[in-house]
Amino acid sequence: MRFIISGKTKSVYNFGRPTTKDTDMGLSTHVLDTMHGCPAAGMGVELYTTDGEQATLVKRFTLNHDGRNPDGPLYDNANLQRGTYRLVFDVKGYFAAKGVALPEPNFLNRVALDFGVAHTDQHYHVPLLVSPWSYSTYRGS
């Protein structure tokens, strides 16, 4: 099933997968493999809440074919709390599984992104563009 619904203030795009209104999405991530030009399917990710030096594991998951959490948003707006979070991406494991010859020690092993959530009524999207030698992130929409 493919459809596009568009309105004055909100748009929902569905191309064969379940939809979630953007107003329901509190926290999400998406990883693109810039070496191969594709989503980072199979990469392991961990989500933590952080308080100073203390980090508490919330969830471990493996990215789906689209480079996203297979269960949808990591938090919806109803459950997202104001505070600091950490996403940890297993870059070395992902590229090793893809058969990329990596030096020892590898330049990037795990990429940890620490970020804050100030407004729980907004969508926080944390994309990662990554290769064995570099990464980039930004607050997406």
Language model: regions and residue ranges:
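Short, Lys/Arg-enriched N-terminal segments with co-localized hydrophobic residues
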Residues: 7-24
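Intrinsically disordered, low-complexity N-terminal regions enriched in serine/proline/glycine
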Residues: 12, 47, 84, 123, ...
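Beta-strand-dominated extracellular/periplasmic modules and repeats
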Residues: 24-114, 125
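Compositionally biased low-complexity segments at domain edges in trafficked proteins
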Residues: 118-141
